[in-house]
């Protein structure tokens, strides 16, 4: 039969059936959802739509452009996991990429940018005193690498003055994964782009995930 968006097949308000008085029209067609999956085998289909226009239907994706709003920087990064969806838990279980889905992305590109921009390595595990004594040569090597020209040092120093980093984001950098929200529509434009979660929004979703984890642990017990 096919998916139809017309109202001819619907019953009347009184409950009676309507008689089909004309055939279906092309402009009343509906298409099945893309249900874009998180997979390394990237697959995007070209779809010709009304007016000769084109839509890009992403069926499988694993990368996207994500922007870090407070730092005004965007980087292409890997999608690692779908962790939350306000509308449907099934979409989390099946790792489906849709608009407004909360995902975990690889923090490495942003870490690299932060080091280059501010000269600060974030998310690095702090070594214990004993470990520091064991590896003195490594420390010497890093100080040699850190030597920069005078004008670069001045530039970095100037940037340091206005530098602020959310404690929750710093914590995430330690784990190498950042929480982000998809803002594009993968089934319509063929891309999974979005924003890194920050501030109140990040706190909100962290609480949601914590609660979900707690429920899961309770059910397992």
UniProtKB/Swiss-Prot annotation:
This is Small ribosomal subunit protein eS8. One of its GO terms (cellular component) is ribonucleoprotein complex. Belongs to the eukaryotic ribosomal protein eS8 family. Residues 1-40, 126-151 are annotated as: Disordered. The keyword tRNA processing does not apply. The lineage of its organism: Eukaryota, Viridiplantae, Streptophyta, Embryophyta, Tracheophyta. GO terms for molecular function: structural constituent of ribosome. Keywords: Ribonucleoprotein, Ribosomal protein. GO terms for biological process: translation. Gene3D superfamilies: 3.10.290.70, Ribosomal protein S8e, subdomain (1.10.168.20). It comes from the Eukaryota. Residues 8-26 have a biased composition (Basic residues).
């Amino acid at each position: 039969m096919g998916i139809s968006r017309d109202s001819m097949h619907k019953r009347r308000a009184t409950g009676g059936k309507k008689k089909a008085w004309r055939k279906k029209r092309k402009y009343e067609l509906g298409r099945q959802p893309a249900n874009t999956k998180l997979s390394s085998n990237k697959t995007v289909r070209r779809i010709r739509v009304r007016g000769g226009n084109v839509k890009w239907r992403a069926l499988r994706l694993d990368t996207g452009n994500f922007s870090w709003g407070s730092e005004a920087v965007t980087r292409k990064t890997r999608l690692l996991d779908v962790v939350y969806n306000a509308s449907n838990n099934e979409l989390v279980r099946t790792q489906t990429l849709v608009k407004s889905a909360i995902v975990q992305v690889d923090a490495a590109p942003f870490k690299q940018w932060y080091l280059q921009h501010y000269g600060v390595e974030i998310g690095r595990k702090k070594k214990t005193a004993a470990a520091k004594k064991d590896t003195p040569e490594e420390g010497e090597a890093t100080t040699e690498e850190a030597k920069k020209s005078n004008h670069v040092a001045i530039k970095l120093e100037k940037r340091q003055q206005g530098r602020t980093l959310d404690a929750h984001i710093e914590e995430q950098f330690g784990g190498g994964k950042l929480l982000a929200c998809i803002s594009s529509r993968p089934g319509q434009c063929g891309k999974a782009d979005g924003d890194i979660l920050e501030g109140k929004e990040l706190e909100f979703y962290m609480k949601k995930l914590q609660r979900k984890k707690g429920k899961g642990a309770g059910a397992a017990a």
